[in-house]
Amino acid sequence: MLRIGLTGGIGSGKSTVANYFAELGAPVIDADQIAHEITKPDQAAFKQIINHFGNAVLTKGKFLNRTKLRELIFENPDDRQWLENLLHPLIIAKMKTQLKKIKAPYCILAIPLLAEASQSVDFIDRILVVDAPETLQIQRTKSRDQLSDQQIQLILQSQSPREKRLAIADDVIVNDQTIPILRKAVFQLHCKYLQIAQT
């Protein structure tokens, strides 16, 4: 089975692209979704996060306040590194487990921080980068997440620069046009991946 790593900066449209691949029948394993699962209150990582950050990152219902946690880690690079060191190996292990259960010509592994962690993600055959101009990234993120300009800039600065992402790419979708154009680009890659998977 061909394993495609899907990545891109915040607001690039990688989730939309992953959804389009899923609509075409490709299995999608999503690192963000796994991160949500492993940080639920009954998981070991949840307890470690609370021990490290304290009750400030809890909601009234005793769940993880992801907005508050995001604010803290983007203001403090050491905390961000600590959290990535905790979650990254757990996410990779879950991805590998899920991969074993999939029977398909190819599958999509949606990993936002793939450029930052490409050395430790050694089970990917090709890398697909969803790229967009920074102005569009900011615009999309503002309308979706209601973050301030300063928060968005901090997130952008914490991610690999576009050049680094593009340097590791085998395939690139530039997402700066209309939805039909984006769908067409995904369909073309879908056909390409099916073809590669057969060889």
UniProtKB/Swiss-Prot annotation:
Source superkingdom: Bacteria
Pfam family, one: CoaE
Compartments, as annotated in UniProt: Cytoplasm
Recorded GO CC terms: cytoplasm
Residue ranges constituting the DPCK domain according to the UniProt record: 3-199
InterPro entries per UniProt: Depp_CoAkinase (IPR001977), P-loop_NTPase (IPR027417)
Chief place where the protein resides: cytoplasm
Gene Ontology biological process terms from the UniProt entry: coenzyme A biosynthetic process
Broad EC category: transferase
PROSITE patterns: DPCK
GO molecular function per UniProt: ATP binding; dephospho-CoA kinase activity
Cytoplasm in keyword set: yes
Amino-acid positions noted as binding ATP in the UniProt annotation, renumbered to this chain: 11-16
Entry EC no(s): 2.7.1.24
Keywords of this entry: ATP-binding, Coenzyme A biosynthesis, Cytoplasm, Kinase, Nucleotide-binding, Transferase
Pathway: Cofactor biosynthesis; coenzyme A biosynthesis; CoA from (R)-pantothenate: step 5/5
Catalytic function, reaction form: 3'-dephospho-CoA + ATP = ADP + CoA + H(+)
Job description of the protein: Catalyzes the phosphorylation of the 3'-hydroxyl group of dephosphocoenzyme A to form coenzyme A.
Family: Belongs to the CoaE family.
UniProt cross-references to NCBIfam families, sorted A to Z: dephospho-CoA kinase
Protein name: Dephospho-CoA kinase
